[in-house]
């Protein structure tokens, strides 16, 4: 009886040792929040704005029908015409990610990543380091049918009691061969703060 109780106690002790929680480091006033929750900390551009823009543009572009057949798209940097620092690359990355998840489009190396692609091809083909049967051949990259480009601008109005910020995000899909804008949309966001 004592041996059976000792074995059960040992198993319970071992099991409780395996269920250790990870240590938490840092301040006590920090907590995780819902990444999709509306963020109203300031009237500057924030995560909620980024998510609203990306979701709105992705939905509009996917529903337009222009991307039938999963064409290749090259994404250009969105021009930041605001007085704030806004990482516009995060907006286009979110749009690309959502379109990739839906299977609506394929993406060529964008204008900022193109040099990395060229460097990798040169390294494989000119360095002599790689087995020739595994080397990616030059001249086989797929050209984009469309380019996606846009801008974000803002108008800021202040009084002694209020600050009003109006953002306008514009995005367009251009047919590379014809130069025609095949799709265009914009998302407007207004944020007002009372002092």
Residue ranges of predicted features:
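N-terminal segment of the mature soluble domain
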Residues: 52-55, 60-130, 178-184
């Amino acid at each position: 009886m004592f041996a059976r109780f000792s074995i059960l106690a040992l198993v319970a002790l071992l099991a409780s040792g395996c269920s250790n929680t990870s240590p938490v480091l840092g301040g006590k006033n920090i907590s995780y929040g819902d990444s999709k929750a509306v963020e109203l900390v300031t009237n500057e551009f924030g995560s909620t704005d980024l998510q609203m823009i990306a979701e709105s543009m992705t939905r509009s572009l996917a529903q337009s029908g222009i991307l039938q057949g999963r064409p290749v798209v090259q994404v250009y940097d969105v021009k930041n015409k605001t007085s704030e620092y806004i990482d516009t690359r995060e907006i286009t990355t979110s749009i690309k990610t959502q379109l990739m998840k839906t299977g609506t489009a394929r993406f060529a190396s964008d204008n900022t990543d193109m040099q990395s692609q060229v460097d990798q091809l040169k390294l494989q083909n000119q360095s002599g380091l790689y087995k020739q049967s595994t080397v990616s051949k030059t001249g086989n990259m797929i050209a984009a049918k469309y380019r996606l480009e846009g801008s974000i601008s803002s108008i800021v109005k202040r009084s002694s009691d209020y600050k009003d910020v109006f953002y306008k995000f514009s995005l367009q899909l251009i047919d590379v061969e014809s130069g025609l804008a095949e799709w265009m949309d914009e998302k407007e966001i207004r944020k007002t703060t009372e002092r």
